[in-house]
Amino acid sequence: MKQSSPEGPKNYDSHSNESTADVATPKLAIEVTDLTVAYRERPVLWDVDLSVPSGLLLAIVGPNGAGKTTLIKAILGLIPPAAGQVLIYGRPYAEQRRLVGYVPQRGSVDWDFPTTVLDLVMMGRYGALGWGKRPGQREKELALSALAKVEMTAFVKRQISQLSGGQQQRVFLARALVQDAQIYFMDEPFQGVDAKTEHAIVGLLQELRSEGKTVVAVHHDLQTVPDYFDWVTLLNVRRIASGPVAEIFTDENLRLAYGGRVAFLTHKAHTRPDHSDPADPATHGKWGRIRP
């Protein structure tokens, strides 16, 4: 359905025309082929291909209305596609559901629901327990361990309605961790959190990567993409480009994704977060931010 152009953005996927016979190809965690999603006959995603190797951190980046959240929901089967195929480790998502964890946007959750932090995190184990089984001591221990990783142990008995935005996000991440998934989808995990929570989330993502897990996150802050992620997918209804940040996150590709609505920052103007590695060449260069 697509016609590749030799002058177009470089992409890394199983549909590329480039020869890879002599290159060891990493195992694909996610493979999306010709995915199209429409709302009331209006295309939100159009003919999207995406291949994600296992064991890396991938940012999905694009302007508002680009279809970023829709892409995640379509992969997870939460939105029916008009066309296309999704494979998780080479098999349909329905057969691999237990390998996947999901952290939706905080705004999509009823935080006034009367439940404690510990109970909310243990809900992440329901899929593994099976129908009709209640969580026991093992599930409680797993939940407490996950809460310790996000530094929320002191809040186990607190009602979720009493948490701050950053605390809510940490609890949501803990709920995903107890699923012990191989792939985690996160929809704007850094949105509305304080600097301490953002730092903690970055550390958690890096820990998941060190365990061989794959993380796909919708992300809006273009400045931090090179510091936080290994790969990036630029999306604007269609996939603009996808691959290693150092090769894909270029001025040209950003202009294609944002329609020229990007102000570019020079290296001197780029402020590096405290947890970044100044020796990493992937964090150097020009990066963009969206103009209001």
Show the residue positions of the predicted features:
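The feature captures the beta-strand-to-loop junction immediately N-terminal to the Walker
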Residues: 61-63
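Conserved ABC ATPase "signature" region
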Residues: 122, 137-155
